[in-house]
C-alpha cells in the first residue's frame, strides 16, 4: 500500500493545469454504447475511475485506445450485456451503463455499485424511471436485471439525482417516442452529456434547465462527433482551496469560472480575491481569513464535493464556521482524521461547527473517500511538521497527477510504500 508524506509549507506559488472533469467523462464514456461509430474523446483525465469504466466496456465487447488524455471507443462489436461485480464494485458510476445497455439491447444485468462509502446513494430513482418507460426490473443476487423495450414517458424525479438524470437521458435517447423529464439535475456535467448527444443527432430540448424533452430514435444508434471533456470544477476548487489555506497566490489554467460560482462566492466571503480570464483563475491572498457558513445543495448551489476541502480551509479562519451537509449522510468521516491533526470541530447531525485559528500539527491520518482525501492534503499543507496520508487509492480515483501538480506549486509531497 502506498501513502503520501507531506511537509507543511509557508506558501505555494505558480500555475496548475486543471484536468478534464471525471464526473463529465464517466457518463460520456457510458454514452458511447449508444454510438454507431467510434467515439473520440479529448481532455480525458487519466484516473482510476476512467480506466475502470473503459475496462468494463472492453469486458462487454467494446474496444478502445487511451493515451495522452485522448480516447477512441468503438462499441460496434459490443455483444455482452452483463456488467459483472468484479469491475462494478470498484466504483458507483458503473451503474451508468444500465440505461444505455437496456436501451440498445432490450436487456442487461448490472451489478449493484460500489465506490465511495458516503451514505446510501440509492439507485431507486433510476429504476423507478426505467419501469415507467416499460422496463421489467428485478434485483437478483446483487444484480439489477432489466428487460423490455423502452417507450417515452412523462417522468419526474422525486429528488434531484445527477447519475439518475444521466442514466435516464441515455435510456430515453434510443427509446420509442418522447420522454419528458422533470426535476433534472443541472450540473455542467449533465449539460455536457446532453450537448454531446444533441451533436450526435438526438432531438433534445431544454438543455441546461430542470425540464427536458427527449425524442427517442426508436433504437437507431447515434453518429457521435469528436468532443472535449469540460474542465474539472471540483479539482479546480480543490486547488483554489490549496492556495487559500496557505494564503498564497496561485493560478489555475484550463478552468471555467462560470462553473465555480458558489465556490468563488464563498472564497470571496472568506476574504480572498481573484483575477479571472476566459480560461484561468488566479487567487490572491486574504488580509484576514474570515469564517463562513456553507449549505450544500444541488448545482448551482454549493457542491457537496467541495464540503470537506472548505472544512479544512475553515480551520484557518479567524472565527467559527458552520457547514450544513444536506445531500449525503455520513459525509463527515474526515472529521475524526482532522481532529488527529489538532482541529476543533463539533458535529451535530448534518451540521459541523468549526473553530478556526487553532494550529494544526502533522499526523498519520487515513483517507475515507475521494474528497475527504483532498481535505487531508490541504490540512497537511497548513500543518506544522510532517503528515502521512494512508489509503490514498481514493485520491487516485479522481485526481490526475496530484503529486506532480502540488510539487509544481512548491509543495513538499512524496508517494511512498508502507
From Swiss-Prot:
Residues at which phosphoenolpyruvate binds: 22-23
Protein name listed in UniProt: UDP-N-acetylglucosamine 1-carboxyvinyltransferase
One Gene Ontology term from the biological process aspect of the record: cell division
Source lineage: Bacteria, Pseudomonadati, Campylobacterota, Epsilonproteobacteria, Campylobacterales
PANTHER family: UDP-N-ACETYLGLUCOSAMINE 1-CARBOXYVINYLTRANSFERASE
EC number(s) stated in the UniProt entry for this protein: 2.5.1.7
Single GO term (MF): UDP-N-acetylglucosamine 1-carboxyvinyltransferase activity
Role: Cell wall formation. Adds enolpyruvyl to UDP-N-acetylglucosamine.
Amino acid at each position: 500500500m502506498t501513502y503520501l508524506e507531506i511537509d507543511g509549507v509557508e506558501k505555494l506559488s505558480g500555475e496548475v493545469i486543471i484536468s478534464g472533469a471525471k464526473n463529465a467523462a464517466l457518463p460520456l464514456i457510458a454514452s458511447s454504447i449508444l454510438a454507431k461509430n467510434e467515439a473520440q474523446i479529448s481532455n480525458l483525465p487519466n484516473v482510476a475511475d476512467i480506466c475502470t469504466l473503459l475496462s468494463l466496456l472492453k469486458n462487454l465487447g467494446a474496444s478502445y485506445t487511451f493515451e495522452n488524455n485522448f480516447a477512441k471507443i468503438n462499441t460496434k462489436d459490443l455483444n455482452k450485456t452483463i456488467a459483472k461485480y468484479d469491475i462494478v464494485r470498484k466504483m458507483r458510476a458503473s451503474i451508468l451503463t444500465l440505461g444505455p445497455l437496456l436501451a440498445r439491447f432490450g436487456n442487461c444485468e448490472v451489478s449493484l455499485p460500489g465506490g465511495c462509502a458516503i451514505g446510501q446513494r440509492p439507485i431507486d430513482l433510476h429504476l423507478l424511471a426505467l419501469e415507467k418507460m416499460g422496463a421489467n426490473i428485478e434485483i437478483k443476487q446483487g444484480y439489477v436485471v432489466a428487460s423490455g423495450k423502452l417507450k417515452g414517458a412523462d417522468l419526474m424525479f422525486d429528488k434531484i439525482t445527477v447519475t439518475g438524470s444521466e442514466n435516464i437521458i441515455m435510456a430515453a435517447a434510443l427509446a420509442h417516442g418522447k420522454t419528458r423529464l422533470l426535476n433534472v439535475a443541472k450540473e455542467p456535467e449533465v449539460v455536457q452529456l446532453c450537448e454531446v448527444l444533441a451533436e450526435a443527432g438526438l432531438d433534445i430540448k431544454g438543455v441546461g434547465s430542470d425540464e427536458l424533452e427527449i425524442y427517442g430514435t426508436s433504437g437507431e444508434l447515434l453518429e457521435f462527433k469528436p468532443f472535449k471533456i469540460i474542465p474539472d470544477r471540483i479539482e479546480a476548487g480543490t486547488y483554489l482551496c490549496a492556495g487559500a489555506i496557505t494564503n498564497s497566490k496561485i493560478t489555475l489554467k484550463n478552468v471555467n469560472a462560470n462553473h465555480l460560482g458558489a465556490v468563488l462566492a464563498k472564497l470571496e466571503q472568506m476574504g480572498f480575491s481573484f483575477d479571472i480570464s476566459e480560461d484561468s483563475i488566479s487567487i490572491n491572498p486574504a488580509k484576514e481569513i474570515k469564517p463562513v457558513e456553507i449549505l450544500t445543495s444541488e448545482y448551482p448551489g454549493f457542491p457537496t464535493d467541495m464540503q470537506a476541502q472548505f472544512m479544512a480551509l475553515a480551520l484557518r479562519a479567524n472565527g467559527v464556521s458552520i457547514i450544513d451537509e444536506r445531500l449525503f449522510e455520513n459525509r463527515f468521516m474526515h472529521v475524526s482524521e482532522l481532529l488527529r491533526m489538532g482541529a476543533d470541530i463539533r458535529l451535530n447531525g448534518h451540521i459541523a461547527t468549526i473553530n478556526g485559528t487553532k494550529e494544526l500539527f502533522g499526523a498519520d491520518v487515513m483517507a475515507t473517500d475521494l474528497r475527504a482525501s483532498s481535505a487531508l492534503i490541504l490540512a497537511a499543507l497548513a500543518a506544522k511538521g510532517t503528515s502521512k496520508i494512508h489509503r490514498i487509492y481514493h485520491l487516485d480515483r479522481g485526481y490526475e497527477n496530484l503529486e506532480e501538480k502540488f510539487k509544481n506549486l512548491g509543495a513538499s509531497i512524496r508517494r511512498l510504500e508502507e
